[in-house]
């Protein structure tokens, strides 16, 4: 099994004063900056696929912590991992994401199926509408303010600088937050 280290600052767009509300983590986390992924070597479609996988993994972890989801027994996890043919792991923000090379490039895997970029893109467009472009542009500016190795080291702390305030615990599960594009841009300027 090959292991590659890679970072997606997918969570970074989930914050502040965004005109369209988005659900914390699962929706906004998917709207990661594809230019960051390209800067680190992955193309836009690869980044969309991997970002969706990480958002799902993080949502599952939070759900387990809150008692909403029950953990899967270790034996089942191992069995599922063995069924996946030529997969490898990609580390994204400290998470091990199963991935596979397809004819279209690297794709994250969910339930033994590659996550297709087009479906993730449609989802993001449906949630963010015409503001998707400006959110990506702000993240592009933020990503350009750092060298890739700095992003690998500081991705989550950057996210913490502008993540939305939502209720803790079960009350915050699925809560909506705002995206403050100006705050994201200011972080790039502060750098």
Descriptions of predicted regions:
Residues 2-191:
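Solvent-exposed interaction surfaces and binding hotspots enriched for charged
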């Amino acid at each position: 099994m090959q292991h590659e280290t890679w970072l997606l600052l997918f969570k970074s767009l989930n914050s502040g004063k965004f005109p369209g509300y988005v659900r914390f983590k699962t929706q906004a986390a998917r709207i990661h900056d594809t230019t960051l992924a390209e800067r680190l070597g992955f193309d836009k479609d690869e980044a969309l696929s991997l970002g969706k996988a990480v958002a799902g993994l993080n949502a599952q972890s939070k759900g387990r912590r809150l008692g909403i989801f029950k953990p899967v027994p270790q034996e089942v996890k191992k069995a599922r991992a063995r069924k996946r043919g030529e997969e490898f792991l990609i580390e994204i923000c400290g998470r091990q994401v199963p991935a596979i090379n397809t004819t279209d490039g690297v794709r994250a895997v969910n339930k033994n199926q590659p996550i297709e970029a087009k479906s993730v893109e449609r989802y993001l467009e449906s949630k963010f509408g015409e503001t998707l472009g400006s959110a990506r542009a702000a993240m592009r500016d933020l990503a350009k303010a750092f060298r890739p190795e700095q992003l690998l080291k500081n991705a989550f702390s950057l996210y913490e600088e502008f993540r939305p305030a939502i209720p803790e615990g079960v009350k915050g599960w699925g809560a909506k937050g705002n995206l403050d594009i100006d705050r994201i841009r200011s972080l790039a300027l502060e750098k």
